Structure formats: C-alpha cells, structure tokens
Amino acid sequence: MSEGIKDQPGLSEAAAQSRASVLRSRAESYIALSRHDAAIADLTESIALMPGNARAWRLRGESHRVLDRHEAALDDFDEALKLEPDSAYALGSRGQTYAAMDRLEEAMADFEHALTLSPDSLWILEAKADALADLDRLDEALEEHSRIIRLDEDLAYSWVARGDLYQRMHLYQEAIDDYTKALEAEQDHVRALSRRGEALRMADRYEEALADLSRALELDPGNDRALGSRGAVLSELGDNEEALKDLDRAIELDPDYIWAYRVRGEILQELERHEEAVSDFTQALRLEFGD
C-alpha cells in the first residue's frame, strides 16, 4: 500500500485511486476557469492520496507558476520530473518558471531538453525565443520565431510575436509586415492592430497609425497601451487636447505607465503648463529610477 493511502485509512486502495483521479480531473477544469487556488487544493489532496502521479505534480506546479509562486512551482516540477524525467511539458513549464525568475540559462537548458523530446511544440519554441530575447541574443530569437511561423503560418499570434521582436530591433517595416500578416489571419486581432499602430507611429506614418490605434480601441476601449500610443500620435498631428485625454485615460488605467507620464509631460511642457509637466516628469523618474 502506498504512503499516500496509508494517510487515508478509511479508503481502500481502489477508492483512493478513484478519488485522486476525480480530484485531478476537477482540478483541470478549475485551471481552465483560472481558479488556480481551487485547483491547488484538489491537487494537494490528490497528491496526498497518490504521490506517485506525475501529472498531479505537474498540474499543481503549473497553477503555482501562473500565480507567480515560483519556488513552489519549481518544487512541484522537480517532483514531476523525478517521476517522468522525459516530460516535455514539465520541462517547458519549469523553463518558463526559471525565465520568470530571471534564471535564463537554466530556462534555456530546460527548453533545449524539452525540444529534443517535442521538437515542434510551439509554446516551448515561443518560450525559448522569449528567453533568447531576454539574453539579448536577438538574431537567435528571430530564428526561433521564424521557425514557429514555418510550422503554422495561420497563427496570428506567431506573426505578432515576431513583429514585436522586429519592433524591439527597430526594424519597423518588417514589424509592420508581420502585423499585417497577423491581421490577414485574424482581422480584429487587437494586439496586432495596436502594435502595428505603434510601429507606424515610429515610422512617422501618423494617419495610418491613428487608424489602427482607433480600431484597436473600438475593439478594446480599456487598452492602456493603445491609448498611450494614440495620444502620442494625436500630439504629432497637432491635437494636443485630444492627446491629453488619451494619456489621462491610459494613466488612469495603469498608474505605473512610465512612458505615458513622459509623453504627457512633454505635451504639457509644449502647452506651457510647466507645473503639471514637472509633476509628470517627477512621477516618471520615481517609477523608473526610484527618485
């Protein structure tokens, strides 16, 4: 009899296995509903009943990861991998946890191992690309994003992800082209519209940028980044009052939006509202540098 079942003397081994299985299944539905604390409670009982089930450890680790409980997640993924050393899912999830903790070399080791087991796993490839970008290995990250697109050219998200990397590399036309591909796959993809609008702004194509950002905000009125970008575009087009409305709303939605404070401060300075400008620049410095 397993140690877990010994802890539940009122249950036969068959009953304990059955209860543990149902708890795992219910936990998966809780996870799908983003009810991660409820999932963790079920999985903790399931593990107590059947500690040798790798899936239960992995699922609980994933819930801990989503809740940013990184140390607990690592402990669970380690246990899952003791039981199933070649679980690409557990390796990929542990890699994501390491990446969130800025332990990027360990993350890369897990992603590389996972991809030897599941070479075409899009989410693991995506996580590896993100880690490479965080390591400032941008050309390698770009290769991974291109590989993802080759595997499935119909996924809007994959085009957006590569577009974001191009934008980070200041390759704005390439970014615009990728966001356009994303929008061909999914015409109302809010992030693609918002990010293409930002790339167009950086390319000084303000009217086109305004159209994209306004469409993004029709679809998602609370998109603080689209509001910030549109505010900057409106200012470039000479409409500072409307620009300030967008930036006010962006900061209301995200009081820690450093870039929006900087842009609003510059507009206020242009309008000779210097006390307000000083306040915004001071807030930007406080948020970014702790002044």
Predicted regions and their residues:
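Alpha-helical tetratricopeptide repeat
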Residues: 1-291
